[in-house]
A protein has these predicted regions:
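Catalytic alpha-helical scaffold of carbohydrate-active enzymes acting on polysaccharides/glycoconjugates
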Residues: 1-137, 143-165
């Protein structure tokens, strides 16, 4: 039997933030686009008896609050699926309504060791604050991981990295 890992990056889309959309619209368009978002995916996983890992990026909570992350984490866990950590660092300087004018570097590889430790630890804290178990797996946004990322993950106790395309 062939084994596969079903993984789903779960994040708010930067392009909707840049377009200046309100948070409810950003959440809807990012997480439930065209009727095939998280709810549909969870229904299909349930229908076929499959398990998946949802890599959730909590960083937009720095801009839009934690409520939407709590809803995502709750829905995924209630469906018996797994939540792990995803991270797009550009959100650390974003501000609601700024049309994308304020942002940090988009790729994790553009941060040094200490900055990566701080970003990953902070994102992990946000995710657990939203109700997720302590994450043991990680996926960098844009799959942009470096040797520093792998070392930072090991230092922080992560067991798996999925930053590979």
């Amino acid at each position: 039997m062939t084994r596969v890992f079903l993984t789903i990056d779960t994040e708010l889309m930067w392009r909707h933030h840049v377009a200046g959309l309100d948070v409810d619209t950003i959440v809807a368009r990012s997480l439930e686009p065209a009727g095939v978002g998280i709810a549909w995916q969870l229904a299909q996983l349930r229908r076929y008896g499959l398990k998946a890992c949802f890599f959730v990026d909590p960083m937009p909570a720095l801009v839009y609050g934690l409520d939407w992350v709590k809803r995502v984490v709750g829905a995924v866990l209630e469906a018996g699926q797994e939540v792990q950590l995803h991270l797009h660092p550009n959100w650390t300087r974003a501000k609601a309504g700024d049309g994308g004018a304020n942002y940090a570097a988009f790729e994790l590889i553009d941060y040094d060791w200490d900055e990566q430790i701080e970003l990953i630890a902070g994102a992990s804290d946000l995710l657990t604050s939203a109700g997720a178990p302590e994450p043991v797996a990680f996926r960098a946004g844009s799959y942009a991981a470096s040797d520093d990322t792998l070392g930072a993950l090991a230092e922080l106790g992560f067991l798996y990295d999925s930053s590979h395309n």
